[in-house]
């Protein structure tokens, strides 16, 4: 076994792997702190990832990186943290998360933000960020599992808003209620197999849906799309009063 310790979303994790690739992937998140929990990958875990994969030619070391993140995602609800499928960008110190079905253009849209806003914007994670629910709000956190363009930053920023993207000829964005947003949130977050972790995930999603603002946007691939999205999503938002039975202290 090859062992390394890494800090993701404020949680310290020991990783025991069969291949070195996952440790290379996570090197910018290395930590010397005492682990909060550990994950160990077996050959069976790698075979299971191969069965899930749409491609049959994926190398074992890559499949192992996915197995590691799956095990981390299974454990993270205990630390008030969710794995989410989306592209997260930070602008002026606030996080904005775009989610949609694969191929819609999440990465293209956040690229437009970087082009329009320049140095004011940077990527938090372009594919699978972590969302940490705290007593002070929701944080969006970088991870090394950052998509085919490998765009991420080892950082944690307050999550301002979430937008569900759809392709359109014109750029139109509208706020949606937490009740409207919840099905999309559930679809795009990792749903643990363990009952306890899944129920905790539902609680955290309920809190998230009452804390941040949600929008639905139909957009094209023009620079105007970024300006329209930011103008709406950066507006003041009054959160609903919705707290889970337990949330993390943000300072943890």
Predicted regions and their residues:
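A noncatalytic interaction/capping subdomain that flanks phosphate/NTP-handling catalytic cores
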Residues: 1-102, 112-122, 130-252
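Conserved lysine of the Walker
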Residues: 106
């Amino acid at each position: 076994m090859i062992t390394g310790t890494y800090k993701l979303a404020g949680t310290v994790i020991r990783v025991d792997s069969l291949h070195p690739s996952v440790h290379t992937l996570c090197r910018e998140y290395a930590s010397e702190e005492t682990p909060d929990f550990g994950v160990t990958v077996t050959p069976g875990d790698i075979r299971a990832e191969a069965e899930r994969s749409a491609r049959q030619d994926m190398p074992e070391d890559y499949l192992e990186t996915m197995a590691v993140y799956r095990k981390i995602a299974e454990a993270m609800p205990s630390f008030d943290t969710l794995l989410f499928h989306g592209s997260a960008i930070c602008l002026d110190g606030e996080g904005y998360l775009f989610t949609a079905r694969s191929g819609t253009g999440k990465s293209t849209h956040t690229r437009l933000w970087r082009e329009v806003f320049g140095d004011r914007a940077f990527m938090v994670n372009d594919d699978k960020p972590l969302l940490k629910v705290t007593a002070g709000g929701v944080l969006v956190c970088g991870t090394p599992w950052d998509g085919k363009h490998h765009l991420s930053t080892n950082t944690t920023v307050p999550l301002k808003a979430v937008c569900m993207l759809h392709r359109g000829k014109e750029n139109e964005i509208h706020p949606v209620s937490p009740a409207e947003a919840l099905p999309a949130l559930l679809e795009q977050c990792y749903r643990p197999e363990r009952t306890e972790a899944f129920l905790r995930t539902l609680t955290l999603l309920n809190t998230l849906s009452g804390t941040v603002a949600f929008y639905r946007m139909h957009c094209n691939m023009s620079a105007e799309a970024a300006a329209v999205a930011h103008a709406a999503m950066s507006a003041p938002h009054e959160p609903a009063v919705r707290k889970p039975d337990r949330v993390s202290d943000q300072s943890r």
